Amino acid sequence: LKKATKLKAIFNVESNFMDNMDYEYCFRNGIYVLSTAPVFAQTVAEIAVGFTLSLKREIHQSHIDFINNKEKYGLESNMNSSLLQNNTVSFIGFGDLAKKLKPLLEPFTNNFLAYDPWLPSKLLEDNNCKINSLNEIFKKSDVIYVLSSITTKNKHMIDKKLLNLMKQNSCLLILSRANVVNFKDLLKISKKRK
């Protein structure tokens, strides 16, 4: 950046700049840092709904079973699947992506929780989200969407303490920066739950 003396702006395709540029340097030197991420919010939101339905209904496993000639039928094919209807759905981070995702989920449920300490409570309440602590979200939720950007304060904030609070059949979908989650803890807990 120091060598780019005529640089006026940087366009980033991510909503988060921490991992790939010195935002503070840009700010101090009058370099605009702009994000194109909001353009992709609807696309990612629709993918998120697809992932959620696949996890809840075990579509991915049914596909694998079908390919391997181990297709199951009737009760056996639905033993571990569940409905999205009337689930408690939570958003960790309530930015552009959450604002696109929530309306897609409203036909299934109206029980939404949110955690976003960087936003005013009124914004979450105006979007019909009950404000909760991370502990409460991990205890109560059937589906948790991790949508927050990474900061120095939230790196690995989702750790074994929180993950161990999750209900047995709840779903965790990480659609933001992976560093918000401690993956070593996630892998250990995932192996225990199988």
Where are these regions (language model features)?
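An N-terminal-biased, well-structured beta-alpha scaffold segment characteristic
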Residues: 1-34, 159
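Phosphate-coordination loops involved in phosphoryl transfer and adenosine-cofactor binding
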Residues: 7, 85-88, 160, 169
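Short beta->alpha connector loops at strand-helix junctions that form conserved
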Residues: 13-14, 30-42, 135, 176
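Phosphate-binding beta-alpha-beta segment of Rossmann-like dinucleotide-binding domains, i.e.
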Residues: 29, 36-88, 103
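Glycine-rich Rossmann-fold phosphate-binding loop(s) that bind the pyrophosphate
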Residues: 94-95
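N-terminal Rossmann-fold NAD(P) dinucleotide-binding loop
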Residues: 98-99
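NAD(P)-binding Rossmann-fold cofactor-contacting core
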Residues: 107-125
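Rossmann-like adenosine-cofactor binding region
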Residues: 119-194
